[in-house]
Regions:
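N-terminal cationic and glycine-rich segments that engage phosphates or anionic surfaces
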Residues: 1-126, 131, 136-140, 237
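Positively charged, low-complexity, intrinsically disordered RNA-binding extensions
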Residues: 140-245
Length: 245
């Protein structure tokens, strides 16, 4: 896997999120609420999906008070019951693999909008399974290097049960099996680590480059349109963007 590309994708998403915190908080809040309603209740100790999303929310700087309020509200009656999770797969320009995870209360609206974005920017929406085989689901934890000792961090990660560890220029990237994510997260948090990003993600086996600037611009516009859509929670892809190097 290309960890360098992974971190660059995260940096781009976080830089974009800094300019749209309200929308990011709303999307994560919806995920939290649905996890409580549909995933096993408000206790993260017995709801592994909720535990994962709390980690994601904290890494995105969602205030603890907001997280607690969302969970408490979702434990009662609410609109989260109306949402369903739908994943779309397709191809961007030049065959870039794209996975789009959504939470929607109107699947026809969401499907139409997602299809429109693919068509508009030189891609096409595919069938279920058409690109997901190119990805592996992994827990991904990103820690800024700062003054941390690489050998010590690697030792702590392996002791915690991480499957892979990589040192990038600015960060340490820690990969886990999905089932081990919560345990590794808890262990490293207890040791004082703070995370730039913490989430179970779809990580591509390989990354692909685009042939020219015009194609890259279309790909970026496709990603922006998808990520800006209120129903879209996550967008995973295997484009290696040289502008992020």
């Amino acid at each position: 896997m290309s960890g360098h590309s992974k971190w660059n994708n995260i940096k781009r998403k976080k830089e974009k999120a800094d300019g749209a915190k309200a929308k990011i908080f709303t999307k994560i809040g919806r995920e939290l609420a649905v996890a409580v309603k549909q995933g096993g209740g408000p206790d993260p100790n017995s709801n592994s999906k909720l535990k994962e999303l709390i980690a994601k929310a904290k890494a995105a700087n969602v205030p603890n008070d907001n997280i607690e309020r969302i969970i408490k509200k979702a434990a009662g009656e609410g609109e989260a019951d109306n949402y369903e999770s739908i994943t779309y797969e397709g191809y961007g320009p030049s065959g870039v693999a794209v996975i789009v995870e959504t939470l929607t209360d109107n699947r026809n609206r969401t499907a139409g909008e997602v299809r429109h974005y693919f068509d508009k920017f030189g891609g096409n929406l595919g069938t279920s399974g058409c690109v997901s085989f190119m990805f592996q689901q992994k827990g991904v934890l990103i820690v800024e290097k700062e003054d941390l000792d690489e050998d010590k961090v690697m030792e702590d990660c392996l002791e915690a049960g991480a499957a892979d560890f990589q040192a990038d220029e600015d960060v340490f990237e820690i990969y886990t099996e999905p089932s081990d994510f919560s345990g590794v997260l808890e262990d490293l948090t207890a040791k004082g680590y703070e995370f730039v990003s913490a989430e179970v993600e779809m990580v591509p086996d390989t990354y692909t480059s685009l042939p020219d600037e015009d194609t890259a611009v279309k790909m970026q516009k496709l990603l922006d349109a998808l990520e800006d859509n209120d129903d879209v929670q996550n967008v995973w892809h295997n484009w290696e963007n040289p502008d992020n190097d």
